Curated annotation (Swiss-Prot):
Record's protein name: Leucine-rich repeat-containing protein 75A
Family as reported in the entry's similarity comment: Belongs to the LRRC75 family.
Coiled-coil features, chain-numbered ranges: none
Start-end of each LRR repeat: 204-217, 229-242
């Protein structure tokens, strides 16, 4: 699969000394990339998970910058921003409107996108600007694709999906975690997962279902089993094909305190069109973990303590690739440094 390439493979293919061929120089590559992705989605129904398209756009953006095609790279970045829910089209909007985040489902991605916009539109003559761009693109590619999942599974990735699933569901969950991330799942596979959760549910603290190809209907199929896990604290559903419709279902089920009784976070980043989290969703999570004391949100510019209970605690609640929480940012610049450190 295309996204299995290593972080250095793109650099080897598009090194500064290499003369690109005519096909790779096409100025409308980004447009054809989007058209091909849309055509595949039309033929395959739900289509590929959106991270395939987004990673391809990041890699093409880096290639354009290496070739000095900053104007085209800026246009491609605009399309990537819109694909990720950052609908603004001007640089000022990107740098200032999104300098403080409100209820974003994936603040790490948005922070990296803002940093990319700065390097593309406001390049600094001093220092290794290209090296900084390459690092940002590596971080964004890593965050938007299942590289970390493949690395965690190590030996399992060489097996077929059914063998991987069987290995993970054999015995008790290690470290109280059911980690199926990166393993493509079918509706029939979910029956086995449901049976496993019912059998071992008392031991499960975390369920990882990122990059498994889940659709809204598949999540709804799992919800009865997931919502009754007594110790579950984190549920990862990132990198799938989920839409805002399932977010409404999750918000409704969280209104019942007997469902997901101990959950503190549900990761819905890098899906089709889930870009922000409604306050009822966040408040329901907060009620389940009052000692945590923070909503996973950053105040918008101009908002203050008088803006309401739901935005009184302005910190980002997310996890880095290693699974630990990222420290809250006091302002945008500090947040950028924190995120970069977490992704290095």
């Amino acid at each position: 699969m295309g996204t299995r390439q290593t972080k250095g493979s793109l650099a080897e293919r598009a090194s500064p000394g290499a003369a690109p061929g005519p096909r790779r120089e096409r100025p409308d590559f980004w447009a054809s990339l989007l058209l091909r992705a849309g055509d595949k989605a039309g033929r395959a129904g739900a289509g590929m998970p959106p991270y395939h398209r987004r990673v391809g756009m990041v890699q093409e953006l880096l290639r354009m910058v290496r070739q000095g095609r900053r104007e085209e790279a800026g246009t491609l970045l605009q399309h990537l921003r819109q694909d990720l829910g950052m609908e603004s089209t001007s640089l000022d909007d990107v740098l200032y409107r999104y300098a403080s985040f409100r209820n974003l489902v994936d603040p790490i991605t948005h922070d990296l996108i803002i940093s990319l916009a700065r390097y593309i539109h406001c390049p600094k003559p001093e220092g290794d600007a290209l090296g900084a761009m390459e690092k940002l693109c590596r971080q964004l590619t890593y965050h938007l694709s299942p590289h970390s999942q493949w690395r965690r599974h190590r030996g399992l990735v060489k097996r077929k999906p059914q063998a991987c699933l069987k290995a993970v569901l054999a015995g008790s969950p290690p470290d109280n975690t059911v980690d199926l991330s990166g393993i493509p799942l079918t509706s029939r596979d979910l029956e086995r997962v449901t049976s496993y959760l019912q059998r071992c549910g008392e031991q499960v603290d975390s369920v990882e279902l990122g990059f498994t190809g889940l659709t809204d209907d598949m999540v709804l199929q799992l919800l009865p089993a997931l919502s009754t896990l007594p110790r579950l604290t984190t549920l990862a559903l990132n990198g799938n094909r989920l839409t805002r419709a399932v977010l409404r279902d999750l918000t409704d089920i969280l209104k019942d305190p007997s469902k997901f009784p101990n959950v503190t976070w549900i990761d819905l980043g890098n899906n089709v069109d889930i870009f922000s989290l409604p306050q009822p969703f966040l408040l329901s999570l907060r009620k389940r973990s009052p000692k945590q004391g923070h909503l996973p949100t950053i105040l918008e510019l101009g908002e203050g303590p008088g803006s309401g209970e739901e935005v009184r605690e302005g910190t980002v609640g997310q996890e880095d690739p290693g699974g630990g929480p990222v420290a809250p940012a006091e302002d945008h610049h500090e947040g950028k440094e924190t995120v970069a450190a977490a992704q290095t």
